[in-house]
Design a protein with these regions (language model features):
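Short, acidic/polar
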Residues: 156-169, 209-213, 250-257, 306-311
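Glycine-rich phosphate-binding active-site loops on the catalytic face of alpha/beta enzymes
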Residues: 179-181, 227-235, 267-279, 310-343
């Protein structure tokens, strides 16, 4: 592709070195993202898009550009930043490399115009493809983590709010909803910001209860809506397709309506009477059994569930539960979280084995 321009007047070594370095940078960043799409997300479409862009970059990476490389004479090889040595979680790793790819493509777009006009156009288009890839990665990660989260902590007012939530996260929790009905908005905003940072540090999803505006303000992973809150379609219009939307349901009609309206997950309950929903009669285990048979999206049994009754809830068909008091009021939230997770994992494993055995006899 570069041969037609081998006699171009723009073959100054500096420009060729810039193009060579940024082609390397973009290809390396794409390979890092591709590996996570392939092995971490098990997403063939996302991994395939990364591979396709790498191959397109390779076509532009001609021998002419490679020959201009002067690593010993590159003053930039000695420039470092402390942040380059640290990656706290996979989200940060991906974000850093996506930014690296986007910056490299912008450099290629601008300097490419001096080397070959077609190069500038090609890399501009690729840069927008990377933006789309980044958005798709966020959506895929959130949905995958939701699917893999059997335990959902819904907070209640507590002087130990942050300590309790962090203890649960240390116990393996991957899904947290901040629920606060009485505090001022300034307090809610401050608490939500801190909880979101904490959740993301531990690789967990952070959901805001009720408030779409606060969910956007703190960059939450989603919002949970009650039956009296705004319609799902309205929330989706504000939040976009990247964020999760959950809906509380108390009966089959509400469940089917929430699914039809596009909820990403639903709450099923209250299973037992609970002060958190003092105005709601218990839906009981019958509703849990109905959800087990009919819910086509992730659902969480919720309402009065604790270590003493979780077996009954699981025996009714639940594989995911949402917990409030049993963790928020626990003396040892980490241990209680681990207990719930062990019970949920045990049931999921048994049902997976039963399903495979059943299929083998078909």
């Amino acid at each position: 592709m570069g041969d037609r321009y081998s006699q171009s007047k723009w073959q100054e070594p500096a420009i060729c070195r810039i193009l060579d370095a940024n082609l390397d940078r973009a290809r390396e960043g794409l390979r890092i993202v591709e590996e996570w799409c392939r092995f971490g997300l098990n997403s063939a479409p996302l991994a395939g898009e990364c591979k396709q862009m790498r191959q397109e970059l390779a076509i532009w990476h001609t021998q002419e550009l490679r020959a201009a490389r002067d690593t010993p004479g590159d003053v930039g090889t000695e420039l470092t930043h402390p942040g380059e040595e640290q990656r706290s979680n996979i989200q940060q790793l991906l974000q850093v490399n996506l930014c690296r790819i986007e910056e490299a493509l912008r450099v290629l777009e601008e300097y490419g115009k001096l080397y070959n006009p077609d190069m500038g156009v090609a890399f501009k288009q690729m840069r927008y493809r990377v933006y789309s890839l980044e958005s798709n990665l966020v959506v895929h990660r959130r949905h995958q983590l939701l699917e893999r989260s059997p335990l959902y902590l819904v907070t209640s007012a507590s002087e130990q709010l942050f300590g309790t939530v962090e203890a649960a996260l240390q116990g393996g929790l991957t899904l947290v909803q901040y629920r606060e009905k009485t505090a001022d908005d300034s307090v809610k905003l401050s608490h939500a910001q801190k909880l979101r940072q904490m959740c993301h540090h531990y690789g967990a999803l952070f959901i805001m209860n009720d408030r779409v505006d606060l969910a956007l303000a703190v960059d939450a992973d989603g919002v949970h809506l009650g039956q009296q809150d705004v319609p799902i379609a309205f929330a989706r219009q504000l939040l976009g397709s990247q964020r999760l939307i959950g809906r509380s349901t108390t009966n089959p009609d509400e469940m089917q309506r929430a699914i039809a309206e596009g909820a990403d997950y639903i709450g099923v309950g209250p299973v037992y009477e609970t002060p958190t929903k003092a105005d709601k009669a218990a839906a009981g285990l019958d509703y849990v059994q109905y959800a087990a048979k009919h819910a086509a999206i992730p659902w969480f049994a919720i309402g009065g569930i604790d270590p003493n009754n979780i077996d009954d809830v699981l025996n009714a068909g639940a594989e995911r539960v949402a917990i409030v008091r049993a963790i928020m009021q626990a003396e040892q939230p980490t241990l209680v979280t681990q207990y719930f997770l062990s019970q949920l994992t045990r049931v999921q494993t048994l049902r997976s084995i039963e399903a495979r055995v059943s299929q083998s006899h078909v």
